[in-house]
Amino acid sequence: MYEVKTYYCDGIPTDKDLERAVDATWIYNCMVELRWFYYGEYSILIKPGEKWEDVKANKMPKKYPV
């Protein structure tokens, strides 16, 4: 069982934000919940061992409401 750390972003997360969240899973050996607000509230859960490219391709929303 892993500890969950929560990170917040202003607006849509950039690649740098995703990299930092994935790095935190390795450094702290924990799961990271990345949360942000953009015309609503979004969050994704990043588990240890995932790469930021996979997180970006598979877990990030494809479209946002306008």
Q: What kind of region is each of these model predictions?
A:
Residues 8, 12-57:
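Acidic, low-complexity, intrinsically disordered interaction modules
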Residues 64-66:
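Short acidic DE-rich linear segments
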